[in-house]
């Protein structure tokens, strides 16, 4: 499904969810790697369309820049067993099929981030997409987004999904849970 099919599907699914089941105050958008980029593209598209946004977002090792200009793609090539420039180039070609890699719907790092919900970004120091995550953090912060960046020492791409055997991943899952609870159940955290 070439660009923008995934984003169109995500918009349809989110709008259906909010209409039929859960108010956005109880909804969190999350994604990892390309899914993290898609989650961010969804948020920026919803905001641009004037839709109500979810309560928060969680982005794990987000791939948010399909121009592939991040230095960490090369600097961390020997440290990240899951992500390679060659693999990402292949994915960009298949997904964009000649479309502009700077299009905000494909590379949400280039989108207007103002007005987005509180966002948790998790990335490892050995992740080839480290620069995508840190640049996103900086741009989101400058746009006024309440963003939290967790850069885990010596962790690689998508490390939080390895919670069955990696203690650092279990800590990340706990952090994600606390973040989600804090933003979806505010009455549970009141001091009154």
Question: Model regions: which residues?
Answer:
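Alpha/beta-hydrolase superfamily serine-hydrolase fold, recognizing
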Residues: 1-192
């Amino acid at each position: 499904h070439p660009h923008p099919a995934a984003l169109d599907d995500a918009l349809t699914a989110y709008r259906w969810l909010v209409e039929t089941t859960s108010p956005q105050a109880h909804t969190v958008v999350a994604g990892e790697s390309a899914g993290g980029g898609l989650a961010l593209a969804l948020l920026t598209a919803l905001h641009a369309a004037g839709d109500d946004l979810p309560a928060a977002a969680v982005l794990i090792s987000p791939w948010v820049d399909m121009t592939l200009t991040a230095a960490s793609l090369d600097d961390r090539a020997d440290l990240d067993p899951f992500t390679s420039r060659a693999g990402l180039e292949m994915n960009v070609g298949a997904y964009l099929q000649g479309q502009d890699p700077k299009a905000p719907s494909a590379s949400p790092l280039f989108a207007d981030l103002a007005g987005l919900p509180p966002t948790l970004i998790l990335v490892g120091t050995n992740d080839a997409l480290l620069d995508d995550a840190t640049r996103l953090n900086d741009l989101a912060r400058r746009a006024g987004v309440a963003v939290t960046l967790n850069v885990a020492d010596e962790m690689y791409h998508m490390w939080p999904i390895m919670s069955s055997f990696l203690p650092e991943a279990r800590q990340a899952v706990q952090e994600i849970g606390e973040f989600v609870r804090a933003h979806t159940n505010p009455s549970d955290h009141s001091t009154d």
